[in-house]
Amino acid sequence: MGMRMMFTVFLSVVLATTVVSTPSDRASDGRNAAVHERQKELVPSVITTCCGYDPGTMCPPCRCTNSCPTKPKKPGRRND
């Protein structure tokens, strides 16, 4: 096989996998509709679960007032 033939085969394989892996709009709308309906239940909101809105959370009160003490940096190249 020559280089031109190998390149043509490569392009056809890439094109075929792209066409096969791209879902059609009709099929994807039906599957994603159920996910979008319950998305609010699955994704917790940081604002509604912290700072006094929900007392059962593990959020420290200093986060609400931005008064948490800063942790000392560990020595290393990334902290320079």
Curated annotation (Swiss-Prot):
Pfam families: Toxin_8 (PF07365). It comes from the Eukaryota. The modification 4-hydroxyproline is found at P55, P60, P61, P69, P72, P75. Keywords: Amidation, Disulfide bond, Glycoprotein, Hydroxylation, Ion channel impairing toxin, Neurotoxin, Pyrrolidone carboxylic acid, Secreted, Signal, Toxin, Voltage-gated sodium channel impairing toxin. One of its GO terms (molecular function) is sodium channel regulator activity. Glycans are attached at S45. It is found in: Secreted. Neurotoxin with probable activity on sodium channel. Induces intense repetitive firing of the frog neuromuscular junction, leading to a tetanic contracture in muscle fiber (spastic paralysis). In vivo, shows the same effect as the whole venom when injected on fish prey. This is Conotoxin SIVB. It comes from Conus striatus.
